[in-house]
Amino acid sequence: MSRFTNCIKTARPSAFKTIWWLTKIMVLLSLAIMLLQYIGVIEWISYLLTPIFSHFGLPGEAALAYVSGYFVNCYSAIAVMTTLDLSTRAATILSVMVLCSHNMILETTVQHKTGSPIIKITIIRTLSAFILGWVLNKIMPGSFESSSLTNSIQEELTFAIMLKDWALRTAKNIVLMAVIVYFLTVLQKILTEYGIIEYISRFLKPVMIFFGLSPRCAFLWLVSNTLGLAYGAGIMIEEAEKGETTKEENDLLNMHIGISHSNLEDLLLFTAAGGAYLWMLLSRWCMSLIWVWFFRVTETLSHRDTK
């Protein structure tokens, strides 16, 4: 059997295991969130947050976009953003906040599987969104401006329509997820078998060191930053189970990619919605760098004190 064929064969069990686990999580959590949307819980939380958003230079209506993204995903947030008349400045600030903390329930569940506490990652990502919102409001050119809803048609959806929409959207996401996870698992096996992973780690070593991350996480960092957090989960889980990366290394990586991931599709979508690409990318890289080095320095000092 050729090395290439063997890579495909050995990748199947771990790929299918991850796909099945992600499918269960995606179905259960997305259904629960859809029900919360239907009974009005998401809108109620948005209403409570509305007064806070003036501190981020955003109109009150932006709270609904943020909360929608927080519990659902970026697409949901963008759908609300398109109903608001936002300046580039406001769209950028709101986009950064959503990018830091979107799809929180699903993504923190995935990150927990790789060794990071759900509460810790949730706090870090939520705080990052609020801190960056406040900081960007202070340093970005321009000033606060109110917004108004556009003349988009707001229709009240029945439960049957919402359920059908959820089923179709979830099925599409599961198929896409399955294809990408399987492809990435096979690719990782091939890159490892032919020693290419070592070259990637070596090439990205300066970047990893700058961000405070282990060079052994280079491929995982690359996958998460380009394609997304959930898609790299299968590889990350397998690496952790095999002991290729330590719990501490995974935890630091999770802090970074929790704030900054999917920097191709998601960033382009928010750019199309009015955000400024470089502000959205660099601000989150800075925040993730600060968190990782803060925890590394804190850990070093605590070890020094115990000696």
Language-model regions, residue ranges each:
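Juxtamembrane "helix exit" motif at the C-terminal ends of alpha-helical transmembrane segments
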Residues: 32-42, 76-81, 192, 263-272, ...
